[in-house]
């Protein structure tokens, strides 16, 4: 912790992925890589957080930046590095109404393993697409959400998002 809202720290990662029951017609998607992937990485992250309540923020901002290196000397079959950023903002727009926005990106330098490429989709990212529906070397997305409190612990939300994966 570097201040009231500012954090800096190390990143240590170990990722394990195993593909099984793969149809031979889709083996080309693995680009000649092993169906079992282990990735080890080291790096650093910085975070700035002024949100009033982490799990259901109504005001403040959250910013995150990390850089992770996965070199071959750590035992990785694929040497690459990953830069990730996330920026979120929350603002009250009227009684019970919260406008939330998010911008997120992931960029790989080098040759990431099939298990570590950038993805779009899932319950928190580009809802409506299953997790990993879109995959490539890099991804960027933006989402905007309007939350309205209705009664007690009940509310409604409308949201829109756009994103892209690219090489």
Where in this protein do the model-derived segments appear?
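Gram-negative/organellar outer-membrane beta-barrel architecture
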Residues: 1-38, 43, 120-124, 133-137
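C-terminal outer-membrane beta-barrel translocator/porin domains of Gram-negative envelope proteins
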Residues: 35, 42-152, 156-167
